[in-house]
Amino acid sequence: MFTMKKSMLLLFFLGTISLSLCEQERNADEEERRDEEVAKMEEIKRGLLSGILGAGKNIVCGLSGLC
């Protein structure tokens, strides 16, 4: 009986460690995905901003005739 309790306790302990490691890995994956999404959004914002600035320069250049 005592040996069975020890082995069950050991299995519980190892299962808890395994679960904890899986949870940490999942959290790291989610954080990595969030970082990738933020990077994509920043790229899109930069692209839109440069497009707007380029169009603004063309308008000013066309209206003033100084280019």
Curated annotation (Swiss-Prot):
Segment forming the signal sequence: 1-22
Disulfide bonds: C61-C67
Tissue expression notes: Expressed by the skin glands.
Subcellular location: Secreted
Residues of the propeptide: 23-46
GO BP, one annotated term: defense response to Gram-positive bacterium
Keyword Nuclease tagged: no
Family, per entry: Belongs to the frog skin active peptide (FSAP) family. Brevinin subfamily.
Functional description taken from the UniProt entry: Antimicrobial peptide active at least against the Gram-positive bacterium S.aureus but with otherwise unclear activity spectrum. Lacks hemolytic activity against rabbit or human erythrocytes.
This protein's name: Nigrocin-2GRc
